[in-house]
């Protein structure tokens, strides 16, 4: 980096090349270029609107910035490391295009409020894209759920068989996690959508700017009321990273289940060739790389959140160079969440198949219907805690006899308690066990059908 920087006139010697490279951010903040151009166009329009520059100069600046946009999109404008950052790169190219008028663009503006504006414009756009992806993920979950309302799957607590549930009910749990993610992003958006433009370096400006005018042009909901806060606030980025981390938590939990379900020990799903890989040495293998990568990338997003919190915890007001470190983790988190949502949506839609016969067998090979025996007795007047103890004896008797509950004879049942009758067999059948849980939000088929319909309405379908 040999070219002098805009700020270098106060200095007598050039920046050491290694320090210049260390200081530069153009390698990653180029991600903001389209947003920087948009923000600069609004700033130029405001300068003309308030009479700080002439209308003709404002038009020149806006047109020059638009030319840079086209050059960038066509691959003709690719600033190098000598630009230091995207803001200087744009300003330098603008001056080449429109001449000295380009040097007026930065009037009444600092890179501090400029980068804050760019980052908010970027994140606002990315939040909207992620919300769209979440909706598609939810639609795919609902499509599968709709087809599997009466498909049974073992339900687990402590990763031990607990009670059978509807497969649709299980998938709807992830739908509602995604719904909270969607709503949470909307809440974050409100605090992203605040304009710092016009806050200057930290104290505002002596020029008669109109901050509300630029906020309106850029479709910000409101402006920062305090210039110090405006240039130093990164709460919005931390909030986004929190929301992104929760999205990844939910995707990772689903990934973990798919990994288990695809194993030979579970055999609940089959991974299709389009979404699985093989082993370089073991030819029989079909590896669940997609969910494993999602699970692994979750830690990456968590790390960026932790890094941002640590960056911010000791910063005095207002702007500090530490804040340059807010971008790489933010950009990577955005890209990671988007990639994981896309991959998991494809996996669910095209890459796995539930083995319904295996699932049907699985729910008949355990004692997950034991709670229903206690409910059976309680419905016949036996106090639940007493019924609970009786069922413990039933399970103990069954294990000793090498039987499941369904295999006990009526005599064996009645030896344990006289309240048992022939209808006990229907009461403990997996299908009846699921169907009977018809409380609101439960796994009963009627409730799940209603829940699928309600979920469709919730996402506007």
Swiss-Prot record:
Chief location bin: cytoplasm
Pathway: Amino-acid biosynthesis; L-arginine biosynthesis; L-arginine from L-ornithine and carbamoyl phosphate: step 3/3
NCBIfam families: argH (TIGR00838)
Keyword terms, alphabetized: Amino-acid biosynthesis, Arginine biosynthesis, Cytoplasm, Lyase
Top-level taxon in the UniProt lineage: Bacteria
Entries under Pfam families matching the protein: ASL_C2, Lyase_1
Cytoplasm is among the record's keywords: yes
InterPro entries the UniProt entry points to: Arg_succ_lyase_C (IPR029419), Argininosuccinate_lyase (IPR009049), Fumarase/histidase_N (IPR024083), Fumarate_lyase_CS (IPR020557), Fumarate_lyase_fam (IPR000362), Fumarate_lyase_N (IPR022761), L-Aspartase-like (IPR008948)
EC top class, as a word: lyase
EC number: 4.3.2.1
Biological source species: Trichormus variabilis (strain ATCC 29413 / PCC 7937)
UniProt similarity note: Belongs to the lyase 1 family. Argininosuccinate lyase subfamily.
Reaction(s) the record says it catalyses: 2-(N(omega)-L-arginino)succinate = fumarate + L-arginine
GO cellular component: cytosol
Cellular localization per UniProt: Cytoplasm
UniProt GO MF annotations: argininosuccinate lyase activity
GO biological process, alphabetically ordered: arginine biosynthetic process via ornithine; L-arginine biosynthetic process
Gene3D superfamilies reported in the protein's UniProt record: Fumarase/aspartase (C-terminal domain) (1.10.40.30), Fumarase/aspartase (Central domain) (1.20.200.10), Fumarase/aspartase (N-terminal domain) (1.10.275.10)
Protein known as: Argininosuccinate lyase
């Amino acid at each position: 980096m040999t070219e002098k920087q805009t700020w270098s006139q106060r200095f007598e010697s050039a920046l050491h090349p290694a320090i210049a490279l260390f200081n530069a951010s153009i390698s990653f903040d180029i991600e903001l270029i389209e947003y920087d151009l948009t923000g600069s166009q609004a700033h130029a329009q405001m300068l003309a609107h308030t009479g700080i520059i002439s209308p003709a100069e404002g038009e020149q600046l806006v047109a020059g910035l638009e030319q840079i946009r086209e050059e960038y999109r066509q691959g003709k404008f690719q600033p190098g490391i000598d630009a230091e950052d995207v803001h200087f790169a744009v300003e330098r190219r603008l001056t080449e295009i429109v001449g000295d008028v380009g040097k007026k663009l930065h009037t009444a503006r600092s890179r501090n409020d400029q980068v804050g504006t760019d980052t908010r414009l970027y994140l606002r756009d990315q939040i909207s894209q992620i919300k769209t992806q979440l909706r598609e993920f939810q639609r795919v979950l609902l499509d599968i759920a709709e087809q599997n309302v009466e498909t049974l799957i073992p339900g687990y607590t402590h990763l031990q068989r607990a009670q059978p549930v509807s497969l649709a009910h299980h998938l709807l749990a992830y739908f509602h996690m995604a719904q909270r993610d969607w709503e949470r992003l909307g809440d974050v958006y409100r605090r992203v959508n605040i304009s710092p433009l016009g806050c200057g370096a930290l104290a505002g400006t002596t020029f008669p700017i109109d901050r509300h005018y630029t906020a309106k042009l850029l479709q910000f909901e409101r402006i920062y009321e305090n210039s110090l806060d405006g240039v130093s606030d990164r709460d919005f980025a931390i909030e986004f990273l929190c929301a992104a981390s929760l999205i990844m938590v939910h995707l990772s939990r689903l990934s973990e289940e798919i990994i288990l379900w695809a194993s030979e020990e579970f055999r609940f799903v089959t991974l299709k060739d389009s979404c699985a890989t093989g082993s370089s040495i073991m030819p029989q293998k079909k590896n669940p790389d997609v969910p494993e990568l999602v699970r692994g990338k979750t830690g990456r997003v968590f790390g960026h959140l932790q890094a941002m919190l640590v960056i911010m915890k000791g910063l005095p007001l207002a702007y500090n160079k530490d804040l340059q470190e807010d971008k790489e983790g933010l950009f990577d988190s955005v890209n990671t969440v988007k990639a994981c949502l896309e991959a998991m949506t494809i996996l669910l839609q095209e890459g796995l198949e539930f083995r319904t016969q295996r699932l049907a067998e699985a729910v008949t090979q355990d004692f997950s219907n034991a709670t229903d025996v206690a409910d059976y007795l309680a419905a016949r007047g036996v106090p639940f805690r007493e019924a609970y103890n009786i069922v413990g004896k039933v399970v103990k008797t069954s294990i000793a006899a090498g039987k499941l509950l369904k295999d006990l004879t009526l005599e064996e049942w009645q030896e344990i308690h006289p309240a048992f009758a022939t209808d006990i067999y229907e009461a403990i059948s997996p299908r009846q066990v699921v169907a009977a849980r018809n409380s609101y939000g439960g796994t009963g088929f009627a409730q799940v059908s209603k829940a699928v319909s309600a979920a469709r309405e919730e996402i506007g379908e």
